[in-house]
Amino acid sequence: SGRPPGPGETWRSPDLARTLEKIAATGAEDFYRGELAQRIDDFSRKYRGYIRGEDLEQYSPEWVEPVKVNYRGYDVWELPPNGHGIVALMALNILKGFDSCDGDAALFCHRQIEAVKLAFADCFEYLSDPRYMDVSVEALLSEEYAAQRRKLIGRRALLPAAGTPSRGGTVYLAAADGEGSMVSFIQSNFRGFGSGLVVPSTGISLHNRGCSFTLDGAHVNCIAPGKKPYHTIIPGFLTREGKPIGPFGVMGAFMQ
C-alpha cells in the first residue's frame, strides 16, 4: 500500500504466507537450496549485494555451548560470541567484586554504568566470529581480568568517546514449563526493517547485520567471506545451584 499500517489495523502479506508454507513443506530446504534461494541470489546480484546461493547452500545451524558467570549465587548464561551476551557477563564479573554500596543509589548506578562501559570497550576491540578471535572467551571472563578492569572504576565517570545512538527492530520471546524446560528466543532484522529490501514475490525482508562488520582490514571483526559479524542479540538464562530460575532477554540493540 506504500504506507505503514495504523494502530489496530490488520497487516497481511500473502507472499510471505506462501513462503512460510513452502519452507514448512520442504523442511527449509527450498530456502537454502531451492527456488527461494535462487530468488534471493538473483535479487542480491541485481542490487549489488553479497549474498549468493552458495552462501545459503553452505549454511547449517550450530549447536553451541552457552557461557556463564556466577553472580552472587546465581549462574547467568548467555550465548557465546559472535553475540555480545559476553558483555553482560563481563560487567557482572566486574561488579561482583565490589562491596555493598550501603544504600548509596548513585554509587550503585555509577558502578553498573562504568562496568558496562568497560565491558563494551573490550567487546568492540576483541569480539567477532569466534573462529577469528585472538582473545579467548575464558580470558575475557577470568576473575583476574575482571579484577584488572574493576580497578579502573573510581568515584568519577570514565570518559569514552561519544557514539551514535542505535535504533533496533527486535522481537524477544520467553517461555517455561513446570518441568524446568526453558526457551529464550530472539529474532532481529537489526536496524528498522533491516536493509529495507524485500525479495519480490516472497515477502522476505533482508536484514542488515552486515553493517556490524568493520572495513578496517587489521581488525578482528573485519568483513570476510563466510564470516559472522559482531552481533547484539543476547537471549539468556538464569539458574541457581543447577536449578532453573527463568529465561530473560530484552529488545534494543546495545542497551540489552
For each feature predicted by the language model, list its residue ranges.
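Noncatalytic scaffold domains of N-terminal-nucleophile
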Residues: 1-27, 31-33, 37-83, 141, ...
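Active-site-proximal alpha-helical segments within enzyme catalytic domains
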Residues: 15-22, 93-94, 176-185
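Active-site rim segments in enzyme catalytic domains, especially the processed small/beta chain
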Residues: 50-52, 181-246, 253-254
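Short, small/polar residue-rich loop motifs at catalytic or cofactor-binding pockets
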Residues: 63, 167-170, 231-233
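Glycine-rich phosphate/pyrophosphate-binding beta-alpha loops
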Residues: 77-85, 170-174, 186-197, 250-256
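M16/insulysin-pitrilysin zinc metalloprotease superfamily fold
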Residues: 85-99, 238-246, 253-256
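Internal maturation/activation junctions in enzymes
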Residues: 99-189, 201-202, 209
